[in-house]
Amino acid sequence: MEIFPAIDLKEGRCVRLYQGEFSKETVMNEDPVAQAIIFEKLGAKILHVVDLDGAIVGESVNLPVIEKICKAVRIPVQIGGGVRSLAAVEKLLSVGVEKVILGTAALYDKSFLEEAVRLYKEQIIVGIDAKNGFVATRGWLDVSEISYIDLAKQMESVGVQTIVFTDISKDGTLAGPNFEQLELLQKSVGIRVIASGGVASIQQVKRLNDMNIYGVIIGKALYEKTIDLEKVLQVTKLC
């Protein structure tokens, strides 16, 4: 199982939100580059970075910080937030990003998604963020009428190989992931599923591993030290 330490960028800083509410932010580190280096030194094999400002405005706002992170670490970096054009994908890849996560665009711009997958294959990941089982977009401000399962099936049919699933109600809460929704998702598609939102303990990570979930994104639990990164990496290595 892959462990993805999370760095959420807002106004150039590393922050955490509560249930996706931009008004409920906590600054975890004023220097996201330093935070990336810390995670790498603790043994992280890959980083998950989200441009929260970008998710709202629809373009990469924190690109200079993202580029600095990519240059500062030797491990792969995957980026999401506001990526809604091929030019945006190409720009991120050109500054050293390994994989790009599409969210809103995957739902509303099928031709862009198909072209991105055709050109960049497994480097394109789709983020599916759900509220009460329905897909939320544009920085989680809008909720669509499509279920997360239906969108996941559509993504699989297009050729997407990996999806990141977030239950927004769990994000930043340390209340545990939505195991029920993840289990249904895992049974509904044959592509890799990365779980995100609410993970608070190594026991929960083990349970996700037992469900054959491909990876887990851990944010608040690392910053608040309810999960020790070195320990969870060791545990998942042995699983």
Swiss-Prot record:
Gene Ontology CC annotations of this record: cytoplasm
- According to its UniProt record, this protein's enzyme class is isomerase
InterPro entries linked? Aldolase_TIM (IPR013785), His_biosynth (IPR006062), HisA_bact_arch (IPR006063), Isoase_HisA-like (IPR044524), Isoase_HisA-like_bact (IPR023016), RibuloseP-bd_barrel (IPR011060)
Keyword Chaperone in record: no
Give an example GO molecular function: 1-(5-phosphoribosyl)-5-[(5-phosphoribosylamino)methylideneamino]imidazole-4-carboxamide isomerase activity
- Predominant localisation class: cytoplasm
Please list the residues that make up the active site.
8, 129
Any idea where this protein resides? Cytoplasm
Enumerate the catalysed reactions. Answer: 1-(5-phospho-beta-D-ribosyl)-5-[(5-phospho-beta-D-ribosylamino)methylideneamino]imidazole-4-carboxamide = 5-[(5-phospho-1-deoxy-D-ribulos-1-ylimino)methylamino]-1-(5-phospho-beta-D-ribosyl)imidazole-4-carboxamide
Q: What pathway does the annotation place this protein in?
A: Amino-acid biosynthesis; L-histidine biosynthesis; L-histidine from 5-phospho-alpha-D-ribose 1-diphosphate: step 4/9
EC no. given is 5.3.1.16
* An example Gene Ontology biological process: L-histidine biosynthetic process
Q: Name one Pfam family in it.
A: His_biosynth
Alphabetically list the UniProt keywords.
Answer: Amino-acid biosynthesis, Cytoplasm, Histidine biosynthesis, Isomerase
Q: Which family does it belong to?
A: Belongs to the HisA/HisF family.
Q: Which NCBIfam families match?
A: 1-(5-phosphoribosyl)-5-[(5-phosphoribosylamino)methylideneamino]imidazole-4-carboxamide isomerase (TIGR00007)
* Name of the featured protein: 1-(5-phosphoribosyl)-5-[(5-phosphoribosylamino)methylideneamino] imidazole-4-carboxamide isomerase
Q: What is the lineage of its organism?
A: Bacteria, Bacillati, Bacillota, Bacilli, Bacillales
